[in-house]
Amino acid sequence: SIPVTPCGARTGLSGGSLPVKSGLVLSLEKLNSIIEIDERNLQATVEPGVINEVFQNAVKEKRLFYPPDPASKGSCMLGGNIAENAGGPKALKYGVTKDYVLNLEVVLPSGEIIWTGANVLKKATGYNLTQLIVGSEGTLGVVTKIVFRLIPLPKKDITLLVPFNCSEKACDAVSAIFRAGVTPSALEFIERDAILWTIKYTDIKLEIDDTVQAHLLIEVDGDNLENLYEDCELIENVLKKFECGDILLANSSSEKENLWKLRRSISDAVKSNSIYKEEDTVVPRAELAK
């Protein structure tokens, strides 16, 4: 028998698309249709070769929201996101890929084509095959169609960039924000070298003080702008206890886009400045400073 490894855009960090020696790679990049966006049922049916960001933009036009947004969202494919159970910055508030998958069309190794679930939010019949397939890296079958659930698009968001002279204090501030009762839609830690290399690598203009050792990139979202400002005030009060510097508030869409471009460009920037081996690691939030 010849081993077959399905693959999408090959942007993953854990090697899920690497073929077995003497095996074949099955590229799904040409299965790239958004079949349906069902606004009434808040669902979408897509093929696995659709680019994550293309899908996000398509549902956004209908005031709907698909939260999983890996750093590689501009190039990664939804089939790969399924295979790896991808997350992204918004996983903090909204969860990861598995939380939005309702149903999958899968070709099994036997050649049989099955649907793993149903296009409903609650299904109590039989095994939960959908969640078995998500994160299985293509080892159980080839996903050929995906049914996602969607949510209403938040109307407002605010983005903050917060400098710290001490990396450990920046890390400790993260848990303190949650203890204060605020759940940001995204919260990213960026250390000094990463942000300096990324500024050099991109066309983003940002002044970094010589004493700054780390930044927190924070986003809050919702439907009421007044409530978001209250969240930001609460976050600011927490951060001051950890001796943060002057907080940069993104005042326009372009400023927000630049800050997130900064975050999403870190991997490529670091690669261009060093001998770099990518890893995809997770640590408990409270242990981050260690």
Task: Please report, for each region that a protein language model flagged, where it lies by residue.
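Noncatalytic alpha-helical scaffold of FAD-dependent oxidoreductases
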Residues: 1-290
